[in-house]
Regions:
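Low-complexity, intrinsically disordered or signal/transmembrane-proximal segments
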Residues: 3, 35, 46-48
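Low-acidity, Ser/Thr- and Arg-rich intrinsically disordered low-complexity segments
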Residues: 4-5, 11, 15-34, 40
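Intrinsically disordered, low-complexity regulatory segments in eukaryotic proteins
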Residues: 10-11, 354
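Short basic (Lys/Arg) and small-residue
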Residues: 54-55, 185, 189, 210-291, ...
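N-terminal intrinsically disordered, cationic/polar leader segments
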Residues: 58-63, 88, 92-94, 102-104, ...
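Membrane-interface segments at loop-to-transmembrane junctions
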Residues: 59-75, 103-120, 145-165, 185-197, ...
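Transmembrane alpha-helix detector for multi-pass membrane proteins
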Residues: 77-96, 106-182, 205, 209-212, ...
Length: 521
């Protein structure tokens, strides 16, 4: 009877444990989808969801660091080379077989010489590759922009080539101690390992040829601009999905209540990323609201204001010190800007290339015009998308977290303002800017965005009237401005492609000059 009672009670306890586990799982699913946490499961769900998501974000941060670390793949290459060399050295090959005829056929001295030559050659090659890599970084920083160094450091083909060379060196060096004599006095030649070293030497030659080919193409300005443009457009698709229309109503952030607690920056640096999901889940579990007032990419000083947090609902009093601290754990501040959540940084990289090209040291206005063409692709996509702030609410509609994003006018200003000022003495650069504004206006749906475009057109016209003493240069820019204004004022008007836009403006300027000369005559 006692055993039967214990068995029944044990089954009941097991059933209740499984039921509680299902309830906790359901509560976690509901919280991750709607950020609504049942009171009975709030503490468990908060601990589980925030911990799991924080681990995911930490993995993302570590992965982003490893992608820009040059030492990671070569280190793996060394480990793989040592391990594979030790394993292949222990593989025996039966004498007289076809495989034996394909293997290395020399003496132990020959095998040792081959391994030494391959190792020494790889050390020299690694030094050359490192020198060429540093040279490419120097060219990128001096000719294009210092903010492009991160793009070069994240170049995977360069890291793979270095890993191949490091693997070959470690493999050949590690195989030297296996060549010698057996304890019984017989000669031992690791034929498989030596043959593998020769094979890796040929692979390294192919990798060196590919590296030179890739390096010569990677430092071309067109390749660099296209890479930055594609990464920026990828971030635009991530933050502003194409499913959102540009005429979607934009919400206005609420004003913090009187008892709101400020969120202060723990140290100085650039606001790199914000874990929106983590903060929303934390706010849902704690019944708080968090509001940031700083854009991602802005520089903040230690103790500077990042945002506000306050208690939601009818619960009186401001949040305790624990919630702001937990909230700030998901706000990442670093010493440099990144392209993880900062579209303006992608625009900044392209603008920096144009500014360096327009500098007196280079004086290359055509490169600046190419940059404007790439900028027009990004700005046109931004003009066609909704640009709402990242707002998270619970199922009842209560605000959980608000992350502000820059407005369309800000993105347009970043892409146009400095190029307009530094290219004020080159009419073709201003004409390219007007073509950009015309293409952007063609994709605008919101009337306020057309106002921003019209403002930039007016600034270009004012610059041309102030800087150009030659009538033909001024007329060329004013003709292009008239065409861009027509596209702004008449939605649906198609802008000419970049290749013909300057020709149309130049023809208009030439006609105006001829008419002026006829009048003077």
């Amino acid at each position: 009877m006692l055993q039967r009672s214990l068995g029944v009670n044990g089954r009941k306890l097991a059933m209740s444990a499984r039921s509680a586990k299902r309830e906790r799982k359901n509560a976690s699913t509901a919280a991750s989808k709607c950020y609504v946490v049942p009171p009975s499961a709030r503490g468990w769900v908060h601990a589980y969801s925030v911990t799991a998501t924080s681990m995911l974000n930490r993995r993302k941060a570590i992965l982003d660091y490893l992608q820009g670390a040059v030492w990671v793949l070569p280190t793996f290459g060394v480990a793989i080379g040592l391990g594979s060399g030790a394993v292949l050295s222990m593989i025996p090959v039966k004498s007289g077989t076809l495989i034996d005829k394909l293997m290395f056929q020399g003496t132990p001295g020959d095998a040792r010489g081959v391994l030494i030559v391959v190792s020494a050659t790889m050390i020299t090659t690694i030094g050359i590759v490192f020198s060429l890599t540093v040279l490419s970084l120097q060219i990128a920083s001096s000719q294009f922009s210092v903010r492009l160094l991160r793009t070069f450091l994240r170049d995977v083909p360069n890291q793979v080539v270095l890993a191949i060379f490091a693997c070959t060196f470690a493999y050949s060096t590690g195989g030297l101690h296996t060549v010698g004599e057996h304890r019984d006095g017989g000669a031992f030649i690791p034929k498989v390992a030596v043959t593998g070293s020769l094979a890796l030497a040929f692979v390294s030659i192919a990798a060196l040829i590919y590296f030179l080919h890739h390096l010569m193409h990677s430092i071309q300005i067109d390749t660099i601009m296209d890479k930055v443009r594609l990464r920026t457009l990828g971030l635009v698709d991530q933050l502003y999905p194409e499913s959102d229309t540009a005429d979607r109503q934009v919400e206005t952030p609420p004003s913090p209540p009187a008892d709101a607690v400020p969120l202060l920056a723990p140290h100085s640096g650039y606001l790199q990323t914000v874990d929106v999901d983590d903060i929303a889940e934390l706010a849902a579990a704690s019944r708080y609201t968090a509001l940031l007032v700083t854009f991602v990419g802005d520089y903040v000083t230690a103790g500077g204001l990042l945002g506000w947090c306050w208690r939601r609902g009818t619960a009186p009093g401001a949040p305790g010190s624990d919630f702001p601290q937990r909230c700030l754990r998901h706000v990442h501040i670093g010493f440099e800007r990144t392209l993880q959540q900062d579209i303006r940084f992608g625009l900044r990289q392209m603008v920096d290339i144009a500014l360096r090209a327009l500098s007196p040291a280079l004086n290359d206005p055509y490169t600046a015009i190419q940059v404007v063409h790439h900028l027009s692709a990004v700005e046109s996509v931004l003009a066609s998308r909704a640009l709402p702030d990242d707002v998270r609410r619970d199922r009842a509609g209560e605000l959980l977290f608000w992350l502000p994003y820059p407005s369309f006018a800000t993105y347009l200003h970043v892409g146009c303002a400095q190029i307009r000022r530094y290219g004020s003495r080159e009419p073709l650069v201003l004409t390219a800017l007007l073509q950009l504004l015309s293409a952007v206006a063609q994709n605008c749906v919101d009337p306020s965005r057309r106002v921003a475009v019209q403002t930039q057109i007016a600034l270009v016209v004012r610059t041309a009237q102030r800087e150009f003493a030659d009538e033909s240069d001024r007329a060329m820019v004013l003709g292009a401005a008239a065409r861009a204004t027509e596209v702004v004022e008449r939605p649906g008007t198609l802008a000419p492609p970049p290749s013909t836009f300057g020709q149309v403006a130049a023809a208009q300027a030439a006609a105006s000059t001829i008419r002026s000369a006829d009048r003077d005559g």
